UniProtKB/Swiss-Prot annotation:
This is Ferredoxin--NADP reductase. Its cofactor is FAD. Homodimer. PANTHER family: THIOREDOXIN REDUCTASE 1-RELATED-RELATED. One of its GO terms (molecular function) is NADP binding. Keywords: FAD, Flavoprotein, NADP, Oxidoreductase. It catalyses: 2 reduced [2Fe-2S]-[ferredoxin] + NADP(+) + H(+) = 2 oxidized [2Fe-2S]-[ferredoxin] + NADPH. Belongs to the ferredoxin--NADP reductase type 2 family. FAD binds at T20, E39, Q47, Y52, V92, F126, D288, S329. Coiled coil: none annotated. InterPro entries: FAD/NAD-bd_sf, FAD/NAD-binding_dom, Fd--NADP_Rdtase_type_2, Ferredoxin-NADP_redctase_2.
Length: 332
C-alpha cells in the first residue's frame, strides 16, 4: 500500500490528541502558528475519551467536577477557533530531522513535515489487559467490553464487572442505579481501589464476589449468556447469568517506536528541561509522557506544560519572538 505525503511544512506538529495535546494545539493557534495534530485513536481525547468518558474528574482548575467527555468536548470547541489540521487513526512510526532542519514524520498512512514537534502521547500506545479465557475473543464487539463509551447501554441489564482496581469499583458504582443487577468479581479478598470507593461499594447493592475469577464463558452467536466463577482458594464453582461483562484489568502501555527516535528516555518517559525541550533541538514533550525533577502526572500539569512547549517552539522557529506571550484577554 502506498503512503500518502503531505508536502506542507507546518510550524508545529503535535503527536497525541489527548487533553495536553489538544490544549497545545489551541495555544499554537493563539501564538499564530500553523498546527497539525496526529492521533493514533479514531477520536481526539486520548484516554479520557477512550477509557472513561463517563467518569467525573475533580482536579481541573475552575471545575468542581467535570465529566471526562465534557472536558474533551470543551477542549474541541476551544481548539476549533484556529482550525488546526487533525489526522486521526495514524500512529507516528518514524521521526527524522532533515538536512534543512525540518522534521519528517512517517505514520502508518502518511508522511508529514514540520518545523517543530511536540510529543504529548500520554503513556504511549495502550491496550487493555484481556480476559485470559480461550473463548473470550469471540465475544469482543458483542457483550464483552474493555471500554465503556455509554453507560445507558447497560440499563436494565445484568452486568458482571471483573477487576479490583479503581476502574472496576467506579464502574460498578456508576452502573448500580442503571443496571438490573451488578456483580463485581475480584481474585483477591481486598480491593486495590481508593478506600472511600471500596466503602461505598460495600454499602451498595452491588454483589461482591471475592476471591473469585471468571473461569468459563458460556454463550452463543449473540454473546455471553453465563459466566462460571471459580473460588481462587477452594476451587468451588458457581454459574451466574449475565447480559454484559466488563473487564477492568488495567492497561499495558508502551512508548513503542518513540524509543527509537534518539530521545533521552528515563523510566518510560521523555526527559525535558524547564522549557519542555528534549535533547533534540526542535522537539518538545509535555504531559504525562515527559519527565523532569519534581514532575507530577496530572492533566492540570499538562495544561501548564503545553503553553511552555508551544512558546519554546515559537522562539525556536523565530528567535525574535517573545517567550512570554500576550495575555489572551487582549487578543480577541
Amino acid at each position: 500500500m502506498s503512503v500518502r505525503e503531505d508536502r506542507n511544512v507546518y510550524d508545529v506538529t503535535v503527536i497525541g490528541g489527548g487533553p495536553t495535546g489538544m490544549f497545545a494545539a489551541f495555544y499554537g493557534g493563539l501564538r499564530q502558528m500553523n498546527v497539525k495534530i496526529i492521533e493514533s485513536l479514531p477520536q481526539l481525547g486520548g484516554q479520557l475519551a477512550a477509557l472513561y468518558p463517563e467518569k467525573y474528574i475533580y482536579d481541573i482548575a475552575g471545575f468542581p467536577k467535570v465529566r471526562a467527555q465534557e472536558l474533551v468536548d470543551q477542549l474541541k470547541e476551544q481548539l476549533s477557533r484556529f482550525s488546526p489540521t487533525i489526522c486521526l487513526n495514524q500512529s507516528v512510526e518514524m521521526l527524522e530531522k532533515q538536512e534543512d532542519g525540518t522534521f519528517k514524520l512517517t505514520t502508518d498512512k502518511e508522511i508529514h513535515y514540520s518545523k517543530t514537534v511536540i510529543i504529548t502521547a500520554g503513556n504511549g500506545a495502550f491496550q487493555p489487559r484481556r480476559l485470559e479465557i480461550d473463548s473470550a475473543s469471540q465475544y469482543e464487539g458483542k457483550n464483552l467490553h474493555y471500554f465503556i463509551s455509554d453507560l445507558q447501554q447497560f440499563a436494565g441489564k445484568r452486568v458482571l464487572v471483573c477487576g479490583g482496581g479503581d476502574s472496576a469499583v467506579d464502574w460498578s458504582l456508576m452502573l448500580e442505579p442503571i443496571a438490573a443487577s451488578v456483580t463485581i468479581v475480584h481474585r483477591r479478598d481486598k480491593f486495590r481501589a481508593h478506600e472511600h470507593s471500596v466503602e461505598q461499594l460495600m454499602n451498595s447493592r452491588v454483589q461482591v464476589k471475592t476471591p473469585y475469577v471468571p473461569a468459563e464463558l458460556i454463550g452463543d452467536e449473540q454473546g455471553i449468556r453465563q459466566v462460571v466463577l471459580e473460588h481462587v482458594k477452594e476451587g468451588a464453582k458457581e454459574t451466574i447469568d449475565v447480559d454484559a461483562v466488563i473487564v477492568n484489568y488495567g492497561f499495558i502501555s508502551s512508548l513503542g517506536p518513540i524509543k527509537n527516535w534518539g530521545l533521552d528516555i528515563e523510566k518510560n518517559s521523555i526527559k525535558v528541561n524547564s522549557r519542555m525541550e528534549t535533547n533534540i533541538p526542535g522537539v518538545y514533550a509535555a504531559g504525562d509522557i515527559c519527565t523532569y525533577d519534581g514532575k507530577i502526572k496530572l492533566i492540570a500539569c499538562g495544561f501548564g506544560e503545553a503553553p511552555i512547549a508551544i512558546s519554546s517552539a515559537k522562539t525556536y522557529i523565530d528567535p525574535t519572538a517573545r517567550m512570554q506571550p500576550a495575555h489572551s484577554s487582549s487578543l480577541f
